[in-house]
């Protein structure tokens, strides 16, 4: 009885708060009590239209969520659907302004309020808002209706132009309203919303300048665009108050009073120095709340709370600084949909934190959202978890002209305005392919107009020779620079199903086996008789490939010379319902599966990425498991940042591993014996610095259930979810790594099973019969709008069953409105601590600069081989006697390493002789690469080095399974698409060359 009384009081209080708008400005959750109909009914815009038989939904909710991961991306349903909502405004709202904010709809949408047409939104990517004030009925029911068409080929009505980013390869088409909706009620003198396309307003802008990291000081600025919709002048005072993460006020300041005329829009500003600041950083999501308020005659009439953070950035010398510390980018290029099976992209805010937080746990510091502006929920999530973002606007694989380019600039403008207060965004990306210099200048001007003080670099993919770009980087290849930083926009496209450990484990999948065809991302047609082994990995080979590919960037890190790589992002973090090349109908390049269960490469990256540049915390991981048949003899792979790794089996040493690619240790021909397999890492002094182990599990005996949920509990709002984890364990509680049992689930209570994913018919989407894979799986369960206890049972043949109960808490909704704002209650994570004040790297190499060069041919182009421009080259005239070039160095030096990028790097091996003066210091054939090669040469004191071709080069693609989505141009220096690009005819072609001295530590 006592609990019932308490619940009644809480409900009454919540309803009372909604019933009477008492603050100067109210933001309501507008997600509840929508109605959905799939099909086109023009009369649905009318107020009196009968919608009682429509499906009741809580937003965010795409109409085709059931298809997520069941169908391949190009098969996702596109059609017309309607959403309707009945609502009333609280008492006290009369004579106020009312705005609606949709965080995004897909694709083209017509909006109606009380039967009146209020506008169109078509880009399918960004937020949109409308002023509802002229149409609202105060004290009466209002009806909002939205007609949405998510046609893959949707075209802008005014021009007939298709949006470039509405693409069947990368932009999963979860149609309808897959993002949140908010209702804002303000005074007639108010701070505008950052929604430009429809409202033509820019909102609040918070930024910091004169940042002094060591002394914890900065000058914090606040700017608010305000509008006066009274019919008389208003003398406005602008006040700012800054609160720390605990809600404590740390600074108040104000600007000068301003008279704003009727109908006028003005920008008010204020600034003050604040000390004792905590600066936002990687893995340190320290956020402040900045409240900006408008006062008239001593009375507060409007207030906006902006959650933001402060950090210092710098971009130059090929490097990136965050809070005065150099950081090499390491992370993931993630699909903007960031989707899950059975629900698509529409998950609660805490689950976004869980997913994005896993990237930080994996020691990633950057997520590059691909092709489309990320959802605001993901952007705010990255603020909280401390994950740097590269924010796209919208594009596909090529630069564009005309209306399609204008669409891109408009979307970039809107995205910058909407997201410029989010500290985790450090990069604005203008294209997934190189754009022209003129277009780069145009995009830069947009940034300078709307975010001149945000400390963000703007660039595009590639941009190797366009100095107006503030960053760049290719896809798949390795770039270096001593000007604007270069980081790889995508690398390592290989795929691997989590289910496949190795060839020695059930289900004994032969590595690479699966298909000899895949659907082209360029034509959407199936290409047959292709080598698809790289897209059907087992987890051991998938892990090795990930190690090899990261090594290419780590080797060129800051501290290795004047020209460096600023890192790169591996393509996708979690398996995705987008373009794929493997045998499954979704992409499995993720280091986790679609339910965010880690694969082995997750732990490999955790090892390789634990540091800002250099490794700061030694780690170790044994690849795979230790449950095999008694006669198995196999290699054991260990990923570690230690200087030496020793393997022990049941306490007996098996010796030290063979080290390759710096991080990979191989122990060949290890005979399986049940028990404990341990790997111990040692530092350069022989001291143990890290340890990992695998334990043989017994036979499967029991099912274990556990729940991952919001730290604030499960909400009965019809949209919140819990993540149910199921494991098969032995009698001692150890997970059985080879278990693939089919589990049957039953759910009792007010909740909806949305399920998980596994290999099989329809990928088991929505099925309550779901197998574990490698002993584990997960499923999503969504709340109803009725609170209560939910009981879940799991059964399987031959296993002890399991049961778990959990309760959902009420969320108060009155007349379609709620004060509960998902995400507001989630706190920033401070797991990695504040930015260290120590250097992030030690110099390991120094360059010996080139003064000049003399070449056997094309002398005037010799400088192009050392001009820090990877789109230029020197080459001879194709004759062997002219295939040489001699470099004069700035000083006499004992060069012991030569780093080169040779034209056709993935196709050609050049037979070279290298001389220091007249002395031969290296002879051999260069290896094929994805960019740079390193030759360890005999150190001889000299100020002159000659590179000479000694015969025709060997030809053939060394990376035949690595392909782009878009076709490279024939003029590109990898020669991949050039006619006869693998034919050399005594050519010597050098893109860049560097001479180095190693600083032996």
What are these regions (language model features)?
Residues 298, 353-601, 605, 614-626, ...:
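Substrate-binding/catalytic cleft of secreted carbohydrate-active enzymes
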Residues 23, 51-60, 113, 825-895, ...:
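Disordered, acidic Ser/Thr/Pro-rich linker "stalks" and the adjacent N-terminal cap
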Residues 28, 40, 78-200, 388-390, ...:
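Accessory beta-strand-rich segments of carbohydrate-active enzymes
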Residues 61-89, 93-101, 106-114, 119-122, ...:
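Active-site-adjacent substrate/metal-binding segments within catalytic domains
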Residues 215-258, 634-653, 676-681, 740-743, ...:
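Beta-strand-rich binding/interaction modules
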Residues 222-226, 293, 636-639, 680, ...:
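Beta-strand-rich structural segments
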Residues 22-103, 158-170, 174-177, 185-189, ...:
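Extended carbohydrate-recognition surfaces in non-catalytic/accessory domains of CAZymes
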Residues 118, 138, 143-185, 279-291, ...:
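Glycine/proline-rich low-complexity spacer/linker segments in large multi-domain proteins
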């Amino acid at each position: 009885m006592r609990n019932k009384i308490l619940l009644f009081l809480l409900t009454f209080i919540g309803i009372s708060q909604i019933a009477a708008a008492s603050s100067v400005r109210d933001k309501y959750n507008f997600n509840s009590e929508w109605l959905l109909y799939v099909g086109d009914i023009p009369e649905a815009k009318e107020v009196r239209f009968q919608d009682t038989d429509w499906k009741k939904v809580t937003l965010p909710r795409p109409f085709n969520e059931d298809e997520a991961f069941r169908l391949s991306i190009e098969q996702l349903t596109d059609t017309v659907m309607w959403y309707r909502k009945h609502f009333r405004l609280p008492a006290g709202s009369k004579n106020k302004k009312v705005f609606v904010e949709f965080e995004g709809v897909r694709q083209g949408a017509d909006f109606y309020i009380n039967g009146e047409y209020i506008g169109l939104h078509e880009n399918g990517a960004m937020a949109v808002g409308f002023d509802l004030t002229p149409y609202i009925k105060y004290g009466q029911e209002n009806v909002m209706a939205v007609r949405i068409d998510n046609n893959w080929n949707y075209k802008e009505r005014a021009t007939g132009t298709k949006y470039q980013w509405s693409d069947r390869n990368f932009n999963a088409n979860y149609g309808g309203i897959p993002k949140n909706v908010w209702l804002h009620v303000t005074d007639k003198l108010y701070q505008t919303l950052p929604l430009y396309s429809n409202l033509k307003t820019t909102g609040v802008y918070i930024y910091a300048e004169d940042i002094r990291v060591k002394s914890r000081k900065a000058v914090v600025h606040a700017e608010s665009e305000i509008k006066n919709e009274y019919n008389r002048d208003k003398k406005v005072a602008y006040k700012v108050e800054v609160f720390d993460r605990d809600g404590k006020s740390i600074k108040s300041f104000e600007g000068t009073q301003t008279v704003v005329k009727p109908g006028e829009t003005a920008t008010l500003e204020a600034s003050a120095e604040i000390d004792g600041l905590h600066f936002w950083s990687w893995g340190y999501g320290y956020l402040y709340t900045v409240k900006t308020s408008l006062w008239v005659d001593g009375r507060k009439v409007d207030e906006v709370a902006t959650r933001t953070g402060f950090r210092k950035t710098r971009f130059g010398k090929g490097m990136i600084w965050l809070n005065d510390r150099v950081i090499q980018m390491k992370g993931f290029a993630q699909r903007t949909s960031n989707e899950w099976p059975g629900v698509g992209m529409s998950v609660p805010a805490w689950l976004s934190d869980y997913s994005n937080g896993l990237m930080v746990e994996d020691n990633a510091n950057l997520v590059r959202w691909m092709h489309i502006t990320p959802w605001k929920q993901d952007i705010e999530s990255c603020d909280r978890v401390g994950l740097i973002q590269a924010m796209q606007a919208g594009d596909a694989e090529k630069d564009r002209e005309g209306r399609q380019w204008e669409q891109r600039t408009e979307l970039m403008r809107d995205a910058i305005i909407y997201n410029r207060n989010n500290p985790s965004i450090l990069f604005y990306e203008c294209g997934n392919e190189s754009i022209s210099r003129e277009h780069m200048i145009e995009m830069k001007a947009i940034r300078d107009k709307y975010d001149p003080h945000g400390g963000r670099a703007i660039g595009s993919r590639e941009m190797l020779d366009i100095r107006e770009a503030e960053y760049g980087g290719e896809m798949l290849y390795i770039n270096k620079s001593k000007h604007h930083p270069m980081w790889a926009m995508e690398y390592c496209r290989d795929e691997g199903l989590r289910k496949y450990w190795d060839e020695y484990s059930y289900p004994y999948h032969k590595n690479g086996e699966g298909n000899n065809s895949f659907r082209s991302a360029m034509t959407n047609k199936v290409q047959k008789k292709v080598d698809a082994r790289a897209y059907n990995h087992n987890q051991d080979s998938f892990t090795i490939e990930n190690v090899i590919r990261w090594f290419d960037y780590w080797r060129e890190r800051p501290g290795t010379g004047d020209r460096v790589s600023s890192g790169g992002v591996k393509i996708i973090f979690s398996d995705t319902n987008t373009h794929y090349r493997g045998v499954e109908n979704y992409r499995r390049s993720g280091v986790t599966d679609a339910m965010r269960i880690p694969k082995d490469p997750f732990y490999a990256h955790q090892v390789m990425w634990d540091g800002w540049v250099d490794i700061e915390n030694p780690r170790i991981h044994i690849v795979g498991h230790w449950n095999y048949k008694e006669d198995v003899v196999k290699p054991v792979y260990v990923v570690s940042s230690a200087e030496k790794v020793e393997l022990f089996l049941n306490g007996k040493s098996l010796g030290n591993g063979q080290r390759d690619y710096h991080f990979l240790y191989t122990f060949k021909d290890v005979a399986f014996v049940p028990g404990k397999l341990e790997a111990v890492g040692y530092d350069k002094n022989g001291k143990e610095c890290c340890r990992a182990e695998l334990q043989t599990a017994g036979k499967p005996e029991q099912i274990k259930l556990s729940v991952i949920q919001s730290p604030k509990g499960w909400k009965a709002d019809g949209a919140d979810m819990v993540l149910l984890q199921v494991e098969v364990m032995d009698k001692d509680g150890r997970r059985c790594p080879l278990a693939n049992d089919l589990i049957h689930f039953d759910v009792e209570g007010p909740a909806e099973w949305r399920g998980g994913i596994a290999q099989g018919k329809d990928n088991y989407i929505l099925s309550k019969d779901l197998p574990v894979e490698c002993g584990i799986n997960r499923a999503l369960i969504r709340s109803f709008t009725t609170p209560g206890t939910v009981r879940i049972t799991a059964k399987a043949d031959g296993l002890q069953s399991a049961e778990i109960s959990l309760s959902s808490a009420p969320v108060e909704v009155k007349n379609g409105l709620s004060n509960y704002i998902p995400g507001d209650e989630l706190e920033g994570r401070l797991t990695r601590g504040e930015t260290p004040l120590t250097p992030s790297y030690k110099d390991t190499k120094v360059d010996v600069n080139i003064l000049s060069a003399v070449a056997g041919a094309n002398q005037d182009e010799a400088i192009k081989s050392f001009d820090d421009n990877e789109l230029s080259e020197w080459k001879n005239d194709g004759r062997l006697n002219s295939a040489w070039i001699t470099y004069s160095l700035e000083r006499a030096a004992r060069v012991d390493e030569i780093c080169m990028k040779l034209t056709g790097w993935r196709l050609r091996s050049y037979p070279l002789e290298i001389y220091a003066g007249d002395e031969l210091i290296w002879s051999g054939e260069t290896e094929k690469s994805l960019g740079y090669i390193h030759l360890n040469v005999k150190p001889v004191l000299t100020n002159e080095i000659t590179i000479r071709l000694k015969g025709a080069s060997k030809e053939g693609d060394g990376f035949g399974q690595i392909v782009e989505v878009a076709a490279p141009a024939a003029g590109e220096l990898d020669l991949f698409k050039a006619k006869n690009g693998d034919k050399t005819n005594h050519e010597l072609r050098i893109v860049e060359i560097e001479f180095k001295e190693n600083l032996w530590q």
